[in-house]
Every structure is written in structure tokens, then in C-alpha cells.
Amino acid sequence: HGYAKVIMKNSDPMTGIHIDIGNPKRLIFTESPIDLMSYYELHKDSLQNVRLVSMDGLKESTIGRHLSQIQAEISGQPLRWTPEQMADGLQVAIDHHFFEDGKNADLITLALDNDKAGRTFIQELEAKGAVINSDLPELRPGQDKTDWNDALKNQQEEKSDNSRLAQARRKLERLRGEQDEAISRAYSHQA
């Protein structure tokens, strides 16, 4: 099926849509608003003090901007960078050894589509020196790509199947009980 990757009206190409949960201390990036909402739905019980960001594609500039902003917020210092400087924030962080010796290793998670483009984007950022946690939706047998919306739909289908399975098991138990009673009555009439 097709995927819509557009820049939403009233959203800045470098900012994307974002949602803060608690007092953000880390960043999770998705490729699209629907993936952001699906990722949230799948992980809402474990998300604390995080900013979820939709990049509207695969954009290092969006990562740089939000990295710059969150570091300023955490430090309590005003951020006086231009939008262009913020867009280069990831490269500035790499150049200033922000990730050296495992520092800030938990700050950035890329929850991208599990496809060639998503995996390549992660590898390219890591090759530059960024420390990235990747959280990709699991591929099902025969799939070569999937996204967080697919993962949410798959989970909902599995839950639905499980409830039908549970209903079938209860019905089977009830029918076995009725069968046992009928057999007992039949034998009691023969005796």
C-alpha cells in the first residue's frame, strides 16, 4: 500500500509535529504524524519525559533542531540560534563530542519505518558519529517494509483474534460439558 509523506499545513519543514509527555529529557522521532500517533498508542504506558517528533520524512535538520531545543530547555539556558543553526544542531553536537564515550546515548531514538530508507538513514547518522537508538517495527514473514501504523493495526488484529479464540474455547468447554451430561444421562437410562 502507499504511504503519505507530506509536510502538514502549519508545520515548519524543520520542526515537524511534536508532542511533549512530561518534562522531556529525550527525543523519539518518527517519519510521519500517523506513525507518531501509532507509536504513542503502542508505547503510551512506558513513555515518560519524552518529546515525540514527526519529521515529515527523514530529516537530519528536524533532529538537529529538536536536539538544540531540548538541550537548551534541560540546561535552562535561552537558545539564541537561528533556525538554520538549529537545523545543523546534530552535526554541531557531533563536532563538539556530545556523544563521545557513551555520553547522551539515550537521548535520541529513531522510531522509523522498517524499510531500506529508514535503516540507511540510521546507518548514515551513526557513520557521522551520532549515537542513535533505533526502534523499528518488527517485520512479519514475507515483508520487506513496515511502519508503526502497520504495527498498531497488526496488534489490534491479534487482540481481536485472541478474544475470538477465547470465546471459541469457552464455547467448546460448554459443549463438552453438555456432551458429558448427555452421555451420563444416556448411560443412566440403560442401567
Located regions from the model:
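TOPRIM fold recognition
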Residues: 43-191
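Basic, glycine-enriched DNA-binding surface that flanks or lies within the catalytic cores of DNA
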Residues: 1-21, 45
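Conserved phosphate-coordination/catalytic loops
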Residues: 7-9, 30, 84, 88
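Short gly/pro-enriched beta-turn/loop segments at secondary-structure junctions
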Residues: 21-23, 32, 47, 103
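Conserved Rossmann-like nucleotide-cofactor binding loop
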Residues: 35
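Helix N-cap/beta->alpha junction signal
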Residues: 31-32, 114
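Short active-site oxyanion
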Residues: 23-27, 106-109
